[in-house]
């Protein structure tokens, strides 16, 4: 059974607060997205397995802990998810990166897939799917469906801001997936935007409208 973790770290909350401001420009917004992703990655990798390894320090031989050879992958949901990749790779630089491309139909608010490129051995990796916003949950559910159809079993989902509606939909569709959230907001408005939210994350990351 997966777990839902809402981050309460002061640094995460502070940075998200700055991201929400309308006067935060794209350059600063991009930096904040990357920094929050790195902080969330720290928490999301807490349960990675360790193994004992014998090494030699400048003083003597010693037994130290190292990651137990688990292969990792980061899979952003395009396009906004790209903003979280650099922060993730700061902590797990050996991870492979896949990409899932989706956009939200303006009429139905449901996701439409247009691209999928994953590491060849993705089924054997522990996969972290990243997207700054979890609104309706449609794109997240569809992305996890795609991964599972390709044999991926060990999946985590990470977002910066989520709506309760999206969390409910995601956890009901994929109850085995751990979900990591920077901030859980109030609700979705009539246009399916998160309230209070921070606007369109993709537009704010890339300076588009």
Curated annotation (Swiss-Prot):
Pathway where it operates: Pyrimidine metabolism; UMP biosynthesis via salvage pathway; UMP from uracil: step 1/1
Required co-factors: Mg(2+)
Activation/inhibition comment: Allosterically activated by GTP.
Domain of life: Bacteria
EC top class, as a word: transferase
Catalysed reactions, as listed in the record: UMP + diphosphate = 5-phospho-alpha-D-ribose 1-diphosphate + uracil
InterPro entries, per the entry: PRibTrfase_dom, PRTase-like, Upp_B, UPRTase/APRTase, Ura_phspho_trans
EC number: 2.4.2.9
Cofactor remark from the record: Binds 1 Mg(2+) ion per subunit. The magnesium is bound as Mg-PRPP.
Family named by the database record: Belongs to the UPRTase family.
Protein's name in the database: Uracil phosphoribosyltransferase
